[in-house]
Structure formats: C-alpha cells, structure tokens
C-alpha cells in the first residue's frame, strides 16, 4: 500500500499518461480531494490537494495486465480517463476527475473560480478538515495479510536467474550449446 499527497492535477490533467502508468502497477483503493485552504497556513496559498491510496497489483493481476498490454487489449480503469465538467452560473466550466464525484470523497464543495490564468476549480471548506478525514478513513478497506509462499518466490527467483544467465551469455533461447562438461543442451 502506498499513500501519496499530490496536486489535483495528477487526477485532473487531460493528459492521462501518469494515471495510466500508475494503473498498470496498482489499484486506486481510495482518494480524497481536500479543500483549497487545507495547506494555506503552511504554504501561504490556496491549492487543491488530493490524498491517493494505492495497492500494488497481485502477481497474477500484474501478469494479466502485462499480457493485455502485449496484445493491445489493456483497458485502464475509469479513474484514469473519466473527467467531468463543473460550470458556474455564467457557463464557465472546468474539468475534474469523475472519481471524486462517484465516490463522494470531496472534503468540501466544488465550485469554479476566476484566477489570473482563467477559470479554475476550487474546493470550499464546508466543515473542519479533520471531520472529513475521519469519515474518509473509515471507508478505506482493511487489507488482508499477504500469504508468503516460499516455493513461488523461489521459482520466480530461479526464473529470473535463468533469464539473466541467458541474457548475459549473449545466447538465444532455443540454441543448442555445450556445457562445461562438453554435453549438449538446449538453451
């Protein structure tokens, strides 16, 4: 499990490359969008911040994803590409990640505000931040302990060593060669 505190642009950027790459490695377990004022006393500015909780994929899921990437059938989760619009009373709109609406994990009220760079998203504080965080943490699932399988780990290690040996020898899989005793074997 990994927890990141990031700018809203990780989740809201129209270019979804960062989210896409993250989705190949881990599942987004939970996330919360903090009010613009969450770090005002520390940073001296209003900035929308997200807390993202990821859990690394199991080896079987990772294998499945790699297979689908290889045959160009990988379908990223919706939080990678789904953006919603929010508009003010004058029709000025801003895009943001649909995940936060779908999961109701916004620690405040979304609105559009004018800035020196045009219109931008704002999250107005509606209650003390600690209340939002306490409610949110109760929604994060508990993770079961991962069972350690020494045979699987050893088999994976041996496969990696064999692959490295082949790569370092400069030989190709399927080639017939001689070992140290002069016996023929297939790589």
Q: What residue ranges belong to the model's regions?
A:
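Conserved Class I SAM-dependent methyltransferase catalytic core
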Residues: 1-40, 47-54
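Context-gated lysine
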Residues: 8, 19, 24, 40, ...
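Charged, often flexible domain-edge or linker segments that flank or initiate folded functional domains
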Residues: 143-187
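Generic hydrophobic/packing signal
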Residues: 3, 15, 26-29, 48, ...
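Flexible, glycine-/basic-rich loop-and-beta segments that form/coincide
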Residues: 41-156, 160
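Generic preference for hydrophobic/aromatic residues in regular secondary structure cores
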Residues: 28, 73, 78-79, 100, ...
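Residue-identity detector for glutamine
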Residues: 14, 21-24, 67, 116, ...
